[in-house]
């Protein structure tokens, strides 16, 4: 299958036909805003698709221009236009090694496959062939689906919507927007759709969009149901390489926080493991044996804070407030509260151990042995919470909530006995020591109830 012609709409045609970044086509999604520069010679004629967070314009990839040499000037003009509107600006998921006036932060890498090399890849890797064999042995069949089968109200559309809801419900975080919004039906005539069926029932679905300027495809969504046999995802991707055999490349998109990232990014990857399996995403894409990995960047104006632009980007994905997004995620996903409690418990435990070791036990009005025992208990609790965050089970959460409840009762009783002290440091530390177990007990109790509800809702 060749890459289709761009849409007939002139603006959309200019956008998708010139875009070389893998995410360029996603600019057609409903939530995107478009900035168009003045045509030459007054401007560059560039198009930039972006999300407006209220304080920043976060672009989807780099500027799209007829002349690649105009990308850097277009980036500068977009930043200036954002500033005139009272917004910061950055470019998320650009593949350009440099944009004029911008610094770059490596976000991760994306795998690149060449369809013509796929048969040789299969021939070299027995495990990959075995995955395909498993799915076929379970009578999974993949077929290409046309837009007419996916119109609103059609049986297949209803099945895909069901699969999407099931898939989103299995995620550890709330659904996100911007470049990862689940919107497979925009510009359907441009998509490559594949359905994996078993016994006439849909078990997985794949959507790919063109990268026109590189004669390639981006696999934007792979939805896999609970009943999909092992190897179903690989069978879908094998079908992509077959149907798009005339393309120059196919990519599965960004594997975030992978590749030669900075130490602080590796720490962030480790800390957020219960929320997003960064290593698992990279491992899945790697086991298909791409011909190469390409870097993907965040570009932001020189002299500005990279942290601020990262927060802007996260707000674009959260479709608003990060606090509200975190609250929704914590309320609905039982693995999140134990993780949110475990992370601050690590420095708190270190503080308790330091106070015990230095003899400053008057700060919390405990004896040194009691404080050392408390630090040991909290260290064990943090380890258990991290473990539960990966596999939240109602029984485990209820047990830990009970332990936190005992800690809360003892802490409140101790505070009633010795008071909050006199100096600011004593008051702050003792207030934290009293409030934390109470908050933890409430959060873990909620998580246990939520996990119990989800476990009862699972099909037998």
Where are these regions (language model features)?
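A conserved beta-strand-loop-helix scaffold within acyl/acetyltransferase catalytic domains
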Residues: 4-58, 87-99, 103, 116-134, ...
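Cytosolic juxtamembrane helix and N-cap/initiation of the first transmembrane helix
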Residues: 328-344
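Hydrophobic transmembrane helix segments
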Residues: 341-376, 380
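Core segments of alpha-helical transmembrane spans in multipass integral membrane proteins
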Residues: 347, 369-389, 399-409
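Juxtamembrane "helix-exit" motif on the non-cytosolic side of transmembrane helices
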Residues: 351-362, 410-422
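Non-cytosolic membrane-interface motifs at loop->transmembrane helix junctions
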Residues: 363-373, 420-434
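Hydrophobic alpha-helical membrane segments
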Residues: 378, 396-416, 433-440
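Membrane-water interface at the C-terminal end of transmembrane alpha helices
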Residues: 435-460
């Amino acid at each position: 299958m060749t890459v289709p012609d761009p849409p007939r709409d002139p603006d959309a045609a200019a956008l998708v036909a010139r875009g070389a970044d893998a995410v360029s086509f996603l600019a057609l999604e409903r939530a995107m805003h478009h900035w168009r520069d003045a045509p030459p010679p007054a401007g560059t004629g560039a198009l930039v698709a972006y999300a407006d967070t209220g304080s920043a314009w976060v672009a989807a990839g780099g500027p799209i221009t007829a002349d690649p040499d105009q990308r850097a000037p277009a980036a500068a003009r977009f930043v200036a236009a954002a500033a005139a509107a009272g917004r910061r600006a950055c470019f998320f998921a650009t593949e350009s090694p440099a944009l004029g006036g911008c610094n770059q932060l490596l976000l991760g890498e994306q795998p690149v496959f060449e369809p013509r090399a796929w048969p040789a890849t299969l021939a070299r890797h027995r495990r990959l062939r075995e995955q395909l064999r498993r799915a076929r042995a379970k009578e999974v069949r993949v077929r290409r689906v046309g837009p007419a089968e996916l119109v609103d109200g059609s049986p297949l559309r209803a099945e895909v919507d069901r699969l999407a809801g099931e898939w989103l419900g299995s995620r550890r975080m709330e659904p996100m927007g911007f470049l990862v919004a689940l919107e497979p039906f925009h510009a359907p005539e441009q998509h490559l759709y594949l359905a994996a069926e078993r016994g006439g029932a849909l078990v997985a679905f794949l959507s790919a969009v063109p990268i026109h300027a590189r004669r390639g495809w981006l696999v934007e969504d792979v939805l896999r149901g609970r009943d999909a046999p092992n190897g179903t995802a690989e069978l879908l991707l094998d079908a992509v390489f077959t149907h798009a055999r005339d393309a120059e490349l196919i990519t599965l998109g960004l594997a975030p926080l992978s590749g030669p990232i900075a130490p602080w990014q590796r720490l962030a990857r480790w800390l957020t493991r219960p929320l997003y399996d960064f290593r698992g995403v990279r491992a899945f894409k790697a086991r298909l044996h791409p011909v190469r990995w390409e870097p993907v960047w965040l570009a932001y104006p020189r002299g500005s804070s990279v942290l601020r632009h990262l927060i802007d980007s996260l707000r674009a994905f959260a479709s608003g407030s990060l606090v509200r997004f975190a609250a929704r995620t914590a309320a609905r996903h039982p693995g999140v509260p134990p993780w949110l409690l475990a992370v601050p418990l690590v420095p708190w435990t270190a503080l308790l151990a330091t106070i015990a070791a230095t003899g400053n036990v008057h700060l919390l009005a405990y004896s040194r042995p009691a404080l050392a025992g408390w630090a040991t208990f909290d260290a064990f609790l943090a380890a258990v919470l991290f473990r539960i965050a990966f596999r939240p089970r109602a029984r485990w959460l209820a047990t830990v909530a009970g332990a936190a409840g005992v800690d809360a009762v003892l802490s409140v009783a101790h505070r009633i006995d010795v008071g909050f002290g006199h100096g600011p440091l004593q008051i702050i530390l003792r207030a934290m020591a009293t409030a934390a177990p109470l908050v933890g007990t409430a959060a873990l109790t909620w998580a246990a109830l939520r996990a119990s509800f989800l476990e009862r809702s699972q099909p037998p």
